[in-house]
Amino acid sequence: MGITKLAHLIHFDAPASMRSKEIGDYSGKIIALDTSIVVNQFRSALPGHLKLSPLAGLFYRTLAFLEHDIKPVFVLDGKPPHQKRAVLEKRAQSTGWSSSQSPNTGSAFNQECLRLLHLMGVPCIKAPGEAEALCAHLAKIGTVNAVASEDMDTLAFGGTVLLRQLNAKRDSEITEYSLPKLLEALQLKYEEFVDLCILLGCDYCDKIGGLGPSRALKLIKEHHTIEGVMEHVNRKTHPIPLNWQYKDARKLFFETPKIDDPVLAWSEPDEEGLVQFLCKEKPLKEERVRGRMKKFREMLLKRRKQREVNMQMGQTRQSRLEDFFPATRKRRAESAAVKESSGRKQFKIK
């Protein structure tokens, strides 16, 4: 779920903090992805073959990212916080899985993801807790350029740049959210923003009844904290949950994941290893895997040749996807907007 109606609030109250992008705009960028969210997309799109379909989807999508010169970093969930247990059980029931089948808790499936990504030469990190929290932390400390996720709680965890709908299709429209610009537009401190997210509704506790996005924002601007809101809210129209665990939720959003800064490295995919895993041990067709790898090698060769041409012409910059596909009008307009706004004040996220 993430944060209830946060995207709605941003659309109406802070549109300057979001913009439309294309996948080519992230050529050369390092992007962190919550593996469970990527896997869930393939589970819903390709029912049946519980383990194969997500692995096949992960294989094809990762190759597409690499072809676009994106450096993906996949993060696996660790042990979920106890505050999220009820939410996970509810999700499992709604999808028809048992909780043990969920990618959040399936250690065997996590090992298969690790093996696949290792064979593809892509880094994969096991988070101590929520993968989303570690993704946000990596963006906050500058290890990655952005987080690709459909869950808005990336922003509540302090992720500086969130990408939604990054699905590896060249013509798809991606929505990019900037946390510093969002705080500026809403005129909130980061700590106030986290309390706003809890008021809107998150995965870790209940929420005050009857508070919509506009009302919650108004109350936080007036009273700055949840404690201040509780002192002034009408409890008849906005009942406060019994034994409300909002402080635990707040702590989870503020908490820094206990993990050493990862050393990230990418390498060429191991085609024979991939064929052995996906086609010999799993029932994916070998001709499909080899055909996709051939297309991938051709794209890499084309990029290298273009770089050589650029070097001969005295161009030392790294080649981007725009070198192979003409820039669209939207991309040129976005580039101009970025240059125009480059001098704006930035907020530091603690």
UniProtKB/Swiss-Prot annotation:
Predominant location: nucleus
Subcellular location: Nucleus, Nucleolus; Nucleus, Nucleoplasm; Mitochondrion
Keyword hit for Mitochondrion: yes
Superkingdom field: Eukaryota
Record's function text: Structure-specific nuclease with 5'-flap endonuclease and 5'-3' exonuclease activities involved in DNA replication and repair. During DNA replication, cleaves the 5'-overhanging flap structure that is generated by displacement synthesis when DNA polymerase encounters the 5'-end of a downstream Okazaki fragment. It enters the flap from the 5'-end and then tracks to cleave the flap base, leaving a nick for ligation. Also involved in the long patch base excision repair (LP-BER) pathway, by cleaving within the apurinic/apyrimidinic (AP) site-terminated flap.
PANTHER family: FLAP ENDONUCLEASE 1 HOMOLOG-RELATED, FLAP ENDONUCLEASE FAMILY MEMBER
Record-given protein name: Probable flap endonuclease 1 homolog
Species of the source: Danio rerio (Zebrafish)
